[in-house]
C-alpha cells in the first residue's frame, strides 16, 4: 500500500522542498484586494486561492496554521475548510498545523476531527510531550488510510531550550529521546520511499544540532520551520535533507508578504509569492 509519505516524497522529487505556510492574517492581505470582499471568510479564502494558484506547480505541499482561522470564529473556520478543499482540488498535499496533544478518547476525537469530515487533511502536527499514548490513537488512520503526522521534536523557537534540551541521566537531551521513540513507532507505518508516515518537526535555526538529528533519525521525514522570518536559511535547512529529499522547508510570512518587496507589488501579490517560492527553491539547491 502506498502511504501518504510516499506521495509527499514524490512531490518533493518533482517540485522541490518548499512548503508554503498559509498562516493568513488579515493584515497580510493587500487593501486593494481586501476591499473587494464583504466578509472575512471570502477575503481569506480568495487570498489563499490566489497564492495556491500561483504556486501549486512549484511547491511540495501547503501548511495551514489553524490558529489564524480560529481567531475569526466560524467564518475563519469556513475559510480554513475551503482552503483545505482547494488544496485537495488542485492535487496538492495539505499539512494542518493544529499541534494537538492529548490522550485516549480526546486524541481519538482529534484524529476524527482532522482526518474525516469538514476539516479533513493529509497530515496534522501533534505535540508528543505528554507521552507516546498521545500519538497511538492516531495510528489506525496512518495504518489504514493515507494520513500522516508531524510530531514536534526540536522546535525553532528560542524557548525550545527550556525543556527540549534538558539532559537525562544518560546525557541525552529530551528531544533526542522523543525523536527516537517516534522513529520506533514509525516503523509500523513505513512507506516504500524509506520514510515513515510519522514525521518530525525540526527547526532550521541551529546548524550543528541539525546534522546530528539527520544522522540519528534516518527514517524520519522532517517538516522544517524557521526559514526566513525566524532566522533560518538554506544552509541550516539543507542539513536535514538527504539526497535532496527527506524533508520540506516551510516559509509563511516570507512568501505571503513577498509583495512588499516590490513596487506596486500589491497589484500582483500572487506573482510576487511565486517569485519568492522560486527564489527559495534556488537557495535550497533546486534549479
From Swiss-Prot:
InterPro entries, per the entry: Aldolase_TIM, OMPdecase_type-2, OMPdeCOase_dom, RibuloseP-bd_barrel
SUPFAM superfamilies found in the cross-reference section: Ribulose-phoshate binding barrel (SSF51366)
Protein name, per record: Orotidine 5'-phosphate decarboxylase
Single biological process term from Gene Ontology: 'de novo' UMP biosynthetic process
Enzymatic reactions: orotidine 5'-phosphate + H(+) = UMP + CO2
Keywords: Decarboxylase, Lyase, Pyrimidine biosynthesis
Keyword Lyase: yes
Pathway(s) of this molecule: Pyrimidine metabolism; UMP biosynthesis via de novo pathway; UMP from orotate: step 2/2
NCBIfam families: pyrF_sub2
EC number: 4.1.1.23
A Pfam family recorded for this sequence: OMPdecase
Enzyme class: lyase
Domain of life according to the entry: Bacteria
Record-level Gene Ontology MF annotations: orotidine-5'-phosphate decarboxylase activity
Active site: 99
Organism, as annotated: Clostridium novyi (strain NT)
PANTHER family named in the record: OROTIDINE 5'-PHOSPHATE DECARBOXYLASE
Family (UniProt): Belongs to the OMP decarboxylase family. Type 2 subfamily.
